[in-house]
Amino acid sequence: MKPNIHPEYRTVVFHDTSVDEYFKIGSTIKTDREIELDGVTYPYVTIDVSSKSHPFYTGKLRTVASEGNVARFTQRFGRFVSTKKGS
């Protein structure tokens, strides 16, 4: 293997801003920002969604309307589309 071609693997703090949670995870992501947690300075990255805020993981799934996209389209624009085949 060639020396000095691999990215630096280190502990990085990811901040889920939607729920104000911090995660210390090993990563190779590059960032110029830093944060101090527990007396140690870590690289810092903000994220919008994580396992603490995503509806799939939190169990707070949105209820999906019973009609799909095609039904909504037909309801809105059905009067403009001919129902006869081949015309």
Swiss-Prot record:
One Pfam family assigned to this protein is: Ribosomal_L31
Which controlled-vocabulary keywords does the entry list?
Ribonucleoprotein, Ribosomal protein
InterPro entries noted in UniProt: Ribosomal_bL28/bL31-like_sf, Ribosomal_bL31, Ribosomal_bL31_B, Ribosomal_bL31_sf
Please indicate which superkingdom the organism of origin belongs to. Bacteria
Q: Would the keyword Repressor be found if you checked this record's keyword annotation?
A: no
An annotated GO cellular component of this protein is: ribosome
> What's any GO biological process attached to this entry?
translation
Q: Which SUPFAM superfamilies match?
A: L28p-like
One GO molecular-function annotation for this sequence? structural constituent of ribosome
Family annotation (HAMAP family): Ribosomal_bL31_2 (MF_00502)
What does the subunit comment say? Part of the 50S ribosomal subunit.
User: What NCBIfam families does this protein map onto?
Assistant: L31 (TIGR00105), PRK01678.1 (NF002462)
Which family is it part of?
A: Belongs to the bacterial ribosomal protein bL31 family. Type B subfamily.
Spell out the protein name for this chain.
Large ribosomal subunit protein bL31B
Q: What is the lineage of its organism?
A: Bacteria, Pseudomonadati, Pseudomonadota, Gammaproteobacteria, Enterobacterales
